[in-house]
Amino acid sequence: MVKRYGCAGILLFAMGLFPLLAQDNAAAKEMAIKIADRIVASTVYEFKDVKTGKVYTSLDNVSLNPDMRVNSKYLNWHYTNGVTNMALMELGDKIQNRKYEDYVLKNMKFIFDKTNQSYFHRLYDKTFREGGWRAVPRLTWHMIYRNKRLDDNGPMGASLITLNQRHPDDALSKNILKQPIIILWFQNLVWPMEP
C-alpha cells in the first residue's frame, strides 16, 4: 500500500516543504512539480480485465465482468487519490499553472462518464445482489456506490466539490448531490465556500 501511493505522500511532503524551507523553496517546488508531472504522465484512461489482461478504451457493449478494473491507480476512487487531487490543485494554484487542475478535471470526467458509471454501477448492483457487502470491495469505484463510510467519499468528495465549484459540470454535480450531508458539511468546514 505504501509503495502504491508513495507518489501522493511524497507530493504532499514536498508541498509541505514550501513554507518550511524558504531558503530552499526552489528545490521543494521543483520536486513537487517533478512528482506531479510523473503522476500526470503515468495516468492512462482505459480499463483492464485483470484475469485475461485485455485492455479496453471504452466499456460500450462490454459484458459485466467483476474482473474489470480501471487501469490506472490514480483513477481509483480512493482516499489517497482525493488527497492527491487536492494537492495537485493546490500546487497548480501556488505556481499559477492550470495543468494540474485540468488533469484532476479530466480524471473526474472519466470517472463520471455516463458509460463508465453505468457499467460499474450495474456491476456493483449485480455483485451486491449476488454476494452482499463482502463481495463488492474488489470492484472498481465500489466506494462511490457503497457510500457508507467517510472514507468512501471524504477526500474524493471534497476534491470533487472543489473542482465543481471551479468548473460547474452536470455529471459532477449529480454525484455531489448523492453524497451524505456529513461529507458536504465536513468539506465546507475544511474548505469554506467563498461568500
For the regions a protein language model found, what residue spans apply to each?
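Flexible, active-site-adjacent loop/turn segments at secondary-structure boundaries
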Residues: 77, 148, 194
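Low-complexity, Ser/Thr/Pro/Gly-enriched N-terminal "stalk/linker" regions
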Residues: 23-136, 170-174, 178-179, 185-187
